[in-house]
Amino acid sequence: KSDTIRETKYVYDTKNRLVSYTDPEGRTETYTYDCNSNLTKTVDKNGNTLKNTYDNKNRLTERTAKEKKTGKETVHTYRYNAYGDVAVQDDTQFVYGDVSGQVTKETTKLTKNKDVVKNYTYDSNGNKSTFSVKAGEDTKLSLSYEYDGSSRLISVKDSEGNQAVSYTYDTEGSLSERQAANGLKTTYGYDYQNRLTSMTNETGKGVVSKYSSTYLKN
């Protein structure tokens, strides 16, 4: 009987950039970079490729994924505003708040005469306070968010003020309970290091699922 040595191999170029990775099964991934060290091409273990194109400010402008097996290509394009934020991604336009710098509006072209518009507002702490989705003139979703004094989310309500989800926290600030409008309640347990040790999902009819974990003591 002989033991087979299984090894993982990493190869770097003269600029200490990873150019190839070979797993213990002998499958290799390769990585290519431009003169500014931007990752321009990745070929994974299955021969699928991912190509990136950048502008003169090293911002990603196009990403093309190609499946080796089917030859299918998926292309994503990006344009930026004067502040360096993504202004257009594929068919979606983004508008940002002057002060917060957070996205306040997303507009996606659904059909020639119909857009899907998502609107966001934020409170003085930068927490999302409202979110709505419209398709054409129809409002599909409208939610409001409430936070406690520590900016922790405590409730989500619909447009009629009905509570969709509520959240409760323990004395350490960790999420201890999540209650959904459909009756599903999730409770969370933690150890002395505040690591998640249990999660239980239950309804009025009883426990639906349970999760538990233990950790080795340091």
Per-segment meaning from a language model:
Residues K1-D23, R27-D44, N48-D158, Q163-Q179, ...:
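Beta-strand elements of repeat-based all-beta scaffolds
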